[in-house]
Amino acid sequence: MIHFKRSQRKYVKKTYRVLNRHEYEAGLRERGSLTVWISLHDGKLANWDAPRPKKRKPGRQRKYSNHAIETAVTLGMVFGLASRQTEGFICSLFTLLNLNNDVPDHTTISRRKAKLGKVPFYENKQKTPLHILIDSSGLTVHVGQLRKPPKSRHYRKLHLCVDELTGDVVACDLTSKSARDSSRVPSLLKQIDSPISSARADTAYDARGVYEALDNHLAHYSPRVLIPPRKDAQLASTSATTRQRNRNIREQARLGKRKWHTESGYSKRSKVETTFYRYKIILGPAMRARGLASQRVEARIGCKILNTMTELGMPCSEMIG
């Protein structure tokens, strides 16, 4: 007989019902449409060939544009294809469409992917204040064939900043597993040019630098920061950056941890966990590339894919029991 603790009995799995089932299923079908991932204009590929440089540089000139390489990487990630399979898939696609464009081989795709740099994946068109959720998770990487298995698992840390209302990935960063979560918040905020209304993160981000980075993000905006303090957290001297942390410490001590999570709105942070679940289920829990530069490009393209799928349609549900 299994005995549960008293605290474990309070958690009961909720039952939800999808309200927009027909619209959501239509969006799921659109995820497999090639017209979503390949841009065509008048039956021709848009921006596939590299533009001619104004001044000729020494060496061989580029034949394919960055857009062509990004499209090839995107197709491989969406449909779960290896590099050579992606090359064959694009060749057969061009044959069916009667296109005379050349197809980059797998070595060109792998080499050029590391040079794509910061691929844009999010744009706040309305410029409204954001309610952001910050967290990180690990993605395993291939370490090659070793005589002995490694003592610890080798992985990369994917840091995401998610919009609470829309579920879009606002900012992302990829680091080694030794990087601290709190140290990557300034680099995430540099990618956001919109004002921030509130920010939620777990206890790993309970650091002075996180509060300072959020408070100094944009002038005339002071976001509400909801980060549960550590067990040994102490009140600091009152200042502009420590005022919110002291407030979180006092409220959690007065209400209790669980009640503070509910009343303060911190429980909405679980939506960022859903984003990581979507990333690992749709794109896989492991990185395809070997080098860190290519892996960072792959992570940004993965975030762009998730945002595109979010735009196609997401479920709207209500709790029924």
Language model: regions and residue ranges:
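Short arginine-rich
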Residues: 97-100, 308
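Sequence-level motif detector for i,i+2 pairs with an aromatic at +2
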Residues: 13, 31-33, 127-131, 267
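Polybasic low-complexity intrinsically disordered regions
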Residues: 53-70, 74-84, 88, 92, ...
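Basic, low-complexity segments
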Residues: 1-58
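Short, flexible helix/strand-to-coil boundary loops that buttress conserved ligand/catalytic motifs
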Residues: 28, 173, 316
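Helix-centered, glycine/charged polyanion-binding patches within enzymatic domains
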Residues: 2-16, 203-280, 293
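Basic, amphipathic alpha-helical segments enriched in Lys/Arg and hydrophobic/aromatic residues
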Residues: 66-78, 257-321
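A short structural micro-motif
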Residues: 34, 93-96
